[in-house]
Amino acid sequence: MLIKKVHLSWSPIVALLIFPLVAPADSKYPWLDQISRQEQLLMGCENMGLKYKKKVTVNMLNHILVDHHHKLLYCYVPKVACTNWKRVLMVLTGESNATNPIQISASTAHLDNSTLKLSQLTVPEIRESLRQYTLFLVARHPFERLLSAYRNKFLGNNTISNYFKNRYGKYIIQKYRKKSMFADSGSDFVTFREFIQYLIKEGVRSNEHWTPIYDLCLPCSLDYNFISRYETIPDDASTILNMVNAPSLVFPATRSGRTKDNLRFYFQQLSIYEIEALYKLYEADFKLFGYGLEEMLGYDLA
């Protein structure tokens, strides 16, 4: 069943009225960031012809988690601090007895039944929640997120990495590796270029870890009250928790990885054609959330 578009009439004026009242004391005018991010999203949707393009059905809302008590909706995006936000929601909803989100293991946070999904509600409940609750997502540079997924899922040595190697890696190597490459080493590690060739040829929707945010969260079809960014997540999380009257809850510190530092190293392995083709696959995420190539790779596409 289709879910009709819910209009919240968000505007910069509304932001100026709301955010000063809920911003943490040490935050520097977070509502100004929201004005910029909301305008970027609105213009991106309109300029790309994506406004209301997707007809939203119930099963498309699987990534939106629900906290009825705090009237909060969170669209989780893998590789964008979603483990910590899932932990926080488990504390907020009482699904966990923990008082500190970091006490909840990552495996527990990712259990399918750890938090209620919007798609599990009735259609009237979904419409009411979208109308009345605070809906937010966290964005990240598409290429940074993609590299994080590759390194975590294909270069690791744990149960989850082994699953990805078996589920995707063997197929990618079989189809995209040149016969002579690594013939003597017997390497079963997918190279970054092989992974990118797989995405270019077969699409980016085979797994949620590299599916674009545009497809996971439907930002041009649903009205988001708050757009967070991975780069500013400590301040953004504090603002959101203040908005839902949970200021004492501390968002776990985000682990400082080396993904951003490694971007140029990995992307230098790709041809210009491959980078352009990959950009097209994630173009909506780049334009909706205001990301570019220059700040990551040192150049932009002409």
Can you annotate each of these PLM segments?
Residues 2-302:
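Membrane-interface amphipathic segments in extracytoplasmic regions
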